[in-house]
């Protein structure tokens, strides 16, 4: 044995596979205000103790590897390691636990959602000791959140820009999502905005395809914006999707939108990536553009109940990366969303301070300090009969987006927009008068339809439309 080996062995080095519990399971640890805290729902493989599984999660998402290495002695692992500080069984589930892990702040690059997620979820989800793993929540300490600029503008600044207060904003996704020419697309935008909507929207997969190149779409949409503004006296917007194959092309599209005088652009933040999203948010902040965020691909990540990342984590990450709107489900309609859980992450998007509330899926108290809030967007299979519930559930600081619920009106696009605007104004007025939207919603819509033929036609065509499916995508 060489002298070097003898010296290293003499101070406790021992090669071989690690027992993670010895180093990374620390139930006596008191969390610090500066720690990033994570709640993982874990399902260990048969025969793997929960403590070993929780410690493995902490190790593999911080300083650990599968064996002891010589270079461990060149740093202070105790300073930099993640710690599994608590484990609790999940009620009603066999062999499933919530593991709480604390990460020291120095593990993360300032202002980088990309680095934060790469560290916490980048590798550990493929660990063989775990049958399934889901990141349920993160606590972002103010010491870290203050290194992010967050939304380009936020809720209050957007309302001031639009001069619209005291009600939810109304939007519409142009359909069919693919296949329209730029001129016909612009025509649909104009008709919807003229009818009373605040926004129209590119669908998430509208980029720059052969049937409609992005520059042509931007030009015809800008014409529709200015014409509808002149006729209605209201500020209008269309979410021009700047998402592209490269960051350089994305920025070129955003610059062109600003030069046209458009008030808002859009990005698919999960498929486009957090680095691209943060770069676009910086540009929007510096140049007075609002930024609408679509969550395309989110269900691939968040829909399984036992494996993946819960959307509340993706929502927090978006608030840090930057966006003024983000799609957040509906509770009603065709897209999945449980009411209390949905309202939990809606509050995490909008509010400055959110208390821990396990009944709503909020595992940690979150203090955003002064970071601006994000408008939650409700969309997907909604129509005028849903308006009372949406107004009551989401409140004023939200965007209610009706695609088929506008363009599917039997009289055309503009009457569809009129029907939605009348229904919204009726619900807001009824609420302000003290009426119960949850109990009297249908009656409020029927009363309004008596003096709005557009709303009456919408009520008739969608009176029997419901989306009632049980969630079956569980492990």
Curated annotation (Swiss-Prot):
The active site is at 175 (proton acceptor), 294 (proton acceptor). It holds the Pfam family RuBisCO_large. The disulfide bond which can form in the large chain dimeric partners within the hexadecamer appears to be associated with oxidative stress and protein turnover. The modification N-acetylproline is found at residue 3. Substrate binds at residues 123, 173, 177, 295, 327, 379. GO terms for molecular function: magnesium ion binding; monooxygenase activity; ribulose-bisphosphate carboxylase activity. Mg(2+) binds at residues 201, 203-204. The modification N6-carboxylysine is found at residue 201. The keyword Phosphoprotein does not apply. Binds 1 Mg(2+) ion per subunit. Keywords: Acetylation, Calvin cycle, Carbon dioxide fixation, Chloroplast, Disulfide bond, Lyase, Magnesium, Metal-binding, Methylation, Monooxygenase, Oxidoreductase, Photorespiration, Photosynthesis, Plastid. Its cofactor is Mg(2+). HAMAP family: RuBisCO_L_type1. This is Ribulose bisphosphate carboxylase large chain. The lineage of its organism: Eukaryota, Viridiplantae, Streptophyta, Embryophyta, Tracheophyta.
